[in-house]
Amino acid sequence: QIAVAESARNVVCSGAKPMAITNCLNYGNPYKPEVYWTFKESLAGMGDACRKLNTPVTGGNVSFYNENPECAIFPTPIIGMLGVIEDVEKHKMSPSFKNEDDIILYVGSPRIGLGGTEYLKVIHGLTTGDAPLLDLDVELKVQQVVLQAITSGLVTAAHDVSDGGLAVCIAEMGIFSLLGAQIDLSVLSGSVHEIWFSEAQSGIVLTCQPNQKEALIKHLVQGGVEVVQIGTVQGDALMFEGVGSVSLDHLHSIYENAIPKVMS
């Protein structure tokens, strides 16, 4: 479900309506009961999400026996999502911050938790905990309302919260644009690490021009989704209120050199 929902969220954040999917399903030896169970449950979850989001499966493939003598790979469903932008010139959207002083909003109802996150894996070397909870009804509502806001011209940037959580989402928006931000996450409940790195589903970060803030928030609230202001676009660094700051030049260097560093 999460793989399908995140793919659709990405398409919505580009200004497009999700239309259909293809898939590549990668697993270990299906004759092992635990592997076959994960495959069966993945198919069921994918079907539930596709029916809810009205995105039929146009095709795909399955790859089994991805393992070595010690263990199989993690269950890995890969989703390719097709979307349609009605008017590319008017409605196309990107995740990059656009303008100084733009308002930064978090859309969605965060369910705080660190289970299965990149934070646990990278920082603590742990692969544990429950996967993030996904409510498909909430997911559909968030996607529909955000897409309406984008096509209405109320949004200047949109990026879904996924791997790495909210902090990584905001960092990417700054890295892609080299525009900084003043961020105050105290409006969200939970510990600092949970707020920053929880991979709670159905979350999207939007920006808008200051004179559009009231109209955008009104649209989102009337659409039945939660929204809170978490900052403004400004400067050349990401400044987290009460925590510290990091320059975008530093983040950009890390981002651009990540693959060469791993491969060297």
PLM regions and their residue ranges:
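Glycine-rich anion/phosphate-binding loops
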Residues: 1-6
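Gly-rich Lys/Arg/Thr-decorated short loops/hinges at beta-loop-alpha junctions or inter-strand turns
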Residues: 76, 116-133
